[in-house]
Amino acid sequence: MENYALAIANYFIELAHKDKIDIRPLKLMKLVYIAHGYILALLDKPTVGAKLEEVEAWQYGPVFPSVYYSFKQYGSQPIDKKTTVFDFSKIGSGEDCVYTPSLKCDEEKMVCEFVWRNYRNFNDSELVSKLHMNGTPWKECYKQGKNVVIPDKVTKRYYTLVAQNISKRINKQSQKDA
């Protein structure tokens, strides 16, 4: 089964390398979560959590454990390559057991590109601060010392409001320009 959190992470690494922008693990983890939120809100489908793993509220914000463990060896250094996954179900099948998770859905790629354009210039700590603000899913769910699950419905509700606010600002600006 495809790991969508890692597919999103790999897509952000691709975008970062294309734009010649360093991306470190902490920033990557935050961008993956933000993209997940917008995908839930805008595409109305659970791409990540429902398919393989759940988001957890860790000390420095929302985390998909697979993304953390796949990139933790970089520490605070820039990530230089995409991650790969070993698929145990393919052992003995004659198929390659190692693959690079990648997004297949164009709409999901578009959402990730939107997130990248709007958040790429924020550093790690700025993204952590944004995700720790009052009213965020992390703030609602975090319990110190526990990796509490952040339910998709909480994330979707929050990012639906964020998307609605963006839409209102765009409409207001369009009316001013008309």
Task: Indicate residue ranges for each PLM-predicted region.
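Domain-edge interaction signal
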Residues: 1-178
